[in-house]
């Protein structure tokens, strides 16, 4: 079943390549089949927000990826919630 989720990632997650890491990993998941769309961005409070839409299994894989993060990151916690599906989302991108 298709879902759309917002993930807020807290800890040392800015200035460590977190957004590029997420984009790279989503692109790898999407190589086999187009499974995820959405975006990733830094927030002013030092956290990172990921909006992702796709099948539940792909979202679960993404959550595990977010828990690990890139080598220089230190993920302290992740908040997630389901939000309304946006049928206009086609790609996954980094927002500045």
From Swiss-Prot:
Superkingdom assignment: Bacteria
Active site: 19, 42
InterPro entries in UniProt: Acylphosphatase, Acylphosphatase-like_dom, Acylphosphatase-like_dom_sf, Acylphosphatase_CS
Family indicated by similarity: Belongs to the acylphosphatase family.
Annotated signal sequence range: none
Taxonomic classification: Bacteria, Pseudomonadati, Campylobacterota, Epsilonproteobacteria, Campylobacterales
Protein name: Acylphosphatase
Catalytic activity entry: an acyl phosphate + H2O = a carboxylate + phosphate + H(+)
